[in-house]
Structure formats: structure tokens, C-alpha cells
């Protein structure tokens, strides 16, 4: 099992063979192994101020109620036990990983931004149809708008998984991953080796 929870900290660059490579820093300090359930390992990160007695009993190995939890298929890595910290060295330089996070929220967006619609003509007497969606259906038959018709609406804040990202370097509690990853700085990300 090669998986870890981390917090996105921002982007920078590193140099390899006189080439600048953009990287994202992910802070993995504080990720612990909390439980084993049905052949899955529960990784946790962060802590809540309060928890119920049931939750405190469930997480007595780590001594607090976690903020973020993630169940991962697999066995506990060798040399680690319940309550142990997962360290950045779980991964190796050059590993190809997948990263799962929640994309930045954009709020209510129109069809041009959200779906890439071309919009209407800019000239020839057109005054206010430039970024409009246009027709959304036929006439009295079918007499309704089909489900899934692309329209304006809330954009972003979706769970996004990006694959084939390379671990460029590992420094202390930070994993440096090539290129951008989903989410804002300070957001939770899940990093794992692709199966």
C-alpha cells in the first residue's frame, strides 16, 4: 500500500539538468494510520477540537478524533503499526502517482466559461446575445428540455483525479510533484500509486 494524505502548500520550481520543472509542494506531516477495517487501512490527517465518546474510543490508538479520513485497500507497510506516522519516504523519487483533490470553485458560470460554447455573433445588429446559450431544445415535440442539456450553473468544487504525475523530489515532510494538482493552497489531497 503506497498512499498518503497531504495538504497542498503551493507551487515553485526545481532545476534538473539545467531545466526548470514546475512542482507542487504537498505537506504530508501528521498523516497517521488509525484503523484496519475489512482489508482496508484508514489514514487520517488533522484533528477536531471535540469528539463523541464513541469516536474517541474508535481512535484511541492516535488519541484524538481526526478531521480527514481515507480508507485505502492494502496492508500496513512493514515496520509500521496502528498510530504510526506515514512519512514522505513512503514514496520514492521518480514514482508515478495519481492525485485526488477537490477543484477550485468558480461559482455560477455561464455556458461560454463552463462548457466552451462559442456564443452568438458580435456584430450584424446583435446587441446582447454574445455569451447567451441559444436554443435549449425543440418545439412542442418533445415539449421539454432533455436531461443533461448543457447550461449555465455552478462550476468547480468537483472531485478530480489527475494521473501520471511524477514525484520529482522528497524533502523532509514535503513531496514535490510535477506540475499543478487540483485544489487551492491548504486543501486536502490524496496521493497514491496507480494500480
Residue map of PLM features:
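Extended basic (Lys/Arg/His-rich) segments that typically form rRNA-contacting surfaces
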Residues: 1-195
Amino acid at each position: 500500500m503506497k498512499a498518503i494524505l497531504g495538504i497542498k502548500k503551493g507551487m515553485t520550481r526545481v532545476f534538473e539538468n539545467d531545466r526548470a520543472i514546475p512542482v507542487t509542494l504537498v505537506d504530508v506531516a501528521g498523516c497517521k494510520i488509525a484503523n484496519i477495517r475489512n482489508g482496508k487501512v484508514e489514514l487520517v490527517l488533522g484533528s477536531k477540537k471535540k469528539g463523541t465518546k464513541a469516536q474517541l474510543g474508535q481512535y484511541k490508538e492516535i488519541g484524538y478524533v481526526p478531521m480527514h479520513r481515507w480508507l485505502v485497500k492494502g496492508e500496513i507497510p512493514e515496520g509500521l503499526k496502528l498510530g504510526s506516522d506515514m512519512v514522505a519516504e513512503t514514496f520514492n523519487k521518480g514514482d508515478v502517482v495519481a492525485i485526488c483533490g477537490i477543484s477550485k470553485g468558480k461559482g455560477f458560470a455561464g455556458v461560454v466559461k463552463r462548457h466552451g460554447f462559442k456564443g452568438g455573433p458580435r456584430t450584424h445588429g446583435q446587441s446582447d446575445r454574445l455569451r447567451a446559450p441559444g436554443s435549449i431544445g425543440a418545439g412542442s415535440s418533445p415539449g421539454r428540455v432533455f436531461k443533461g442539456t448543457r447550461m449555465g450553473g455552478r462550476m468547480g468544487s468537483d472531485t478530480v483525479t489527475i494521473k501520471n504525475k511524477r514525484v520529482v523530489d522528497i524533502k523532509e515532510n514535503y513531496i514535490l510533484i510535477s506540475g499543478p494538482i487540483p485544489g487551492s493552497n491548504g486543501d486536502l489531497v490524496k496521493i497514491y500509486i496507480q494500480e
